[in-house]
Amino acid sequence: MSSFLVQTAVVRLFLLGVVFWFPFALSSSCAEIASKFGTWKSEGDAPPSYLSPTVDLLDGLDRIRKKIINGTISSQYDFDNLLHRLISQANDGHLQIGLCSREIFRFQHGTPLTSVSREGLDLPQLYVHSDAVIMHSGQVEAISPVVEINGLEADYYLQSRIAVTLGYQDPDARYNALFPSPSAGFTGTYSAGAWASNSGEWPGSAVLTIRFANGTRLEVKPTATWPATNGPMNYTDGQALFEAACLPGTSSKYIFGSFPGMYLGLPAYELPRSGPSVFPAPTIKDSNGLVRLYSLEDAALQDVAVLQITSFRIGGEDSREFSATIRQSLDWASSHGKTKLLLDLSGNEGGNVIPGFDLFRMLFPDEPIRSETRFRSTELLDVLGQAFSAEYRGADAKEILDPPLAAQNAVSPDQEENVFGSWKDLFGPDPNYEGDSMSNAYAVFSFAAASTTFEPISGYGSAPLAIKTRLFEPQSIAVVTDGRCASTCAIVVGLLQAQGVRTVTFGGRPRKAPMQAVGGVKGGQRWSLRTISRHIKTARELLAKQYTSTAAQANSTRRLAVGHLLQKLNDLAPPALPLIPRMEDNEWEFALRFDTYGQSSVNFRDAYVPANETTPWQFIYEAADCRMFLTPENVVDPASRWNSAARAMFGGREMGSEKCVDYVSV
């Protein structure tokens, strides 16, 4: 085990005795806990036009609980995978849960696939990624497409076994996520795609058999990686590993998952090139490499600049540099004769929304930002809102941007202040909202309060207007994606589309039909389970303080009301999680540890668009203006996608818009 990269034979001998036969006495309580956290999820029923199947999470949790009781589930690992698959069926990137046995080993293999159209207009086929590279070199005769995996039609296997677990609301985005991502290297994420990683899950077989159209076969053998963060691999049986990974109260000096570092050892295979190694040198970039400006080499496209933004996961001082780099890039492009702009957001999974708003304002400094959100009006949120709104008043309220449960903080979708006179005015429920019990509409937050010189939204709060006039008109801007645009990325694209900016997207399922540019979550706000725990803890402290206050002592009616709220909070709230990852175990209030790395979350607020203020934006289908299949050149040289996109979006029909698979409005 010293290499920490365990070959398949060892995986079978060791893991079948350790992971797959974990002790299993506590998982029913874990399912009950998950159901309490599940009540925070904001979205309701999807309309018939929604492309992905819907799932009743609470009913699913109840079915899992029954399987535990009747003995159908036999191990902790089986339970954790079943719960993970249920959560993933919501196709909501903001809804995630980190389960203890799934965070021990990461399974993967070294044979990534890719979906390629040989000429760009014919339907793409599946190829081993290395074969696509050979195809690009011209050796087409030696290459054969993949037609089967483990005896099943290959596309069916990939979409039904793996893609359904990936959390994107759009099936084309899920399909693209199966394959290598050239932008993954900028953010340090796995570059080979979900087919090669199986989301870290045991694939169910020690050998995966690929059959090619020419009749040949290839056996793929998964391996397991032991993360260095788990500490030394010195466990001799399943009981010992279970106690370390899943039970609080470890006697170790370090809590499982708290060791520094990433993964020990290197894969026994080469990952597809990604990040800076596969893109040309940028003209301008930030120190984190998340913002990069390029010019196109094609002589016919010298008036086109490309601004590539691979993530919005930044904060603090990095936010200021992020903003300054975008401003510098736009200024440079404008001053060097660039009249057209491609904004490449491929693989951008979102992050901090403030830099996203700032980007929009630098492109459209004369346009105010409108944001509309709602939360589900539940009993528990009502208790929290009453606690926070009663405590934070006047100037104090302005200091509290999160939680957005103090009515004094809330502003209208158009940033009007003082529109909610009480918590009831915000909580609702809105009588005009049909079908679900939802709050009244309000903005993400007050931009005037949130925007600072360190974390600016151009022209709001203390941040000056970074760019005073438009440098590019809407018809001269196009957004490029691979469908894997989510959260803050989705918000940015939505704001740009409202101004008339067009979108072009690459890849997707092998069908000649439209594809969405934004295939990831389009929720209004993600709350981690630790955030929820922090708000519950604070609300409990505030109510206890109010209960013993002088005012309550003098007013028995008020004291009784506060006591009732405190009791209701204790009845409805889920058990507390540690407020930071890997906190001391005495913070835990239930018997199983989960969320070791602090990634579990729910979608707290829905987002809405002006054209439809009663259907969550998550459920609204929005086709890209142009869709393109990936050619071998696009796979090997991802920067070539910019040439294709620019010719399609800016060149007119004579320059190549016929290459759009589904022509909508170019």
Swiss-Prot record:
Keywords: Glycoprotein, Hydrolase, Protease, Serine protease, Signal, Virulence. Glycans are attached at residues 70, 214, 234, 555, 612. Pathway: Mycotoxin biosynthesis. Its EC number is 3.4.-.-. The keyword Phosphoprotein does not apply. It comes from the Eukaryota. Residues 1-27 form the signal peptide. One of its GO terms (molecular function) is serine-type peptidase activity. One of its GO terms (biological process) is proteolysis. Peptidase S41 family protein; part of the gene cluster that mediates the biosynthesis of the phomopsins, a group of hexapeptide mycotoxins which infects lupins and causes lupinosis disease in livestock. Within the pathway, phomP1 and phomP1' are probably involved in the processing of the phomA and phomA' precursors. The pathway starts with the processing of the precursor phomA by several endopeptidases including kexin proteases as well as the cluster-specific S41 family peptidase phomP1 and the oligopeptidase phomG to produce 10 identical copies of the hexapeptide Tyr-Val-Ile-Pro-Ile-Asp. Belongs to the peptidase S41A family. This is Peptidase S41 family protein phomP1.
